[in-house]
């Protein structure tokens, strides 16, 4: 069924690309790196899959997993950037696990926790941080094939460090404990010594980034909420900016792709840089974007080279590149070497 759907979408998108390529930069070319000879790391990122027990949502994710599995050059990793489930329930995690297990989307799979994943309730209908940790670590371990025993952890792929942050509360905004903040600083210090870019994965972006708080609003949450890290945001931002070539990859706010020239139109950019710190915000995979490029089934493919990082917008569900929303980011380590 997925093959049939993909075939139909491929035909439709081929026609669409001819009509709209000059407007949106749609390109239905090979799913492969720009330069296969020199690329060091390639990974797909998606956020906000919001799994329920719906087979329709499972089918939507299958479109993307199929696209990744059939990439001309196998991906080094697929990274889930939180809100993997809608409420952190066992049946939601089970469906997600079983859906992912049908495919081999990448050589590695990694997963961050999001606020929706922390809304697990006990038998009395009360929020349960204990069950949040139990369910997330269990299913993240089973889905990724890694031994994950905390809401935050570090992984390494092709010699590149991935640092995953996780909220330790059940609120919409994140709570990053002092212990986790200290751990983050230590992990960044170790990783920065390698002279390679470091990827910090957090469902929540930094307060004030990517158009926040104007691009965020949650009337159901009684707690003050900025759409970002919350009260610890400034401290986390300062730590991230202590080191060179740090890439923060987030989701959460369900904003669509924007290109470098569209900040004045939409009030935010999908990729923001300050010095050698770079913040990448992903659209929601499952839901239609609330602003920017209106679509779903999308995410960024990250390609790492010796001298740069390419951030490439892709519709995984339609197997199409959205080249208008691509970014190229030079690495400071390469610049230093060139001098």
Language-model regions: role of each:
Residues 175-177, 191-250:
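Active-site-proximal segments of metal-dependent phosphoesterases and phosphodiesterases across multiple
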Residues 40-53, 159-169, 199-203, 277-284, ...:
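Active-site-proximal beta-strand elements of phosphoester/diester hydrolases
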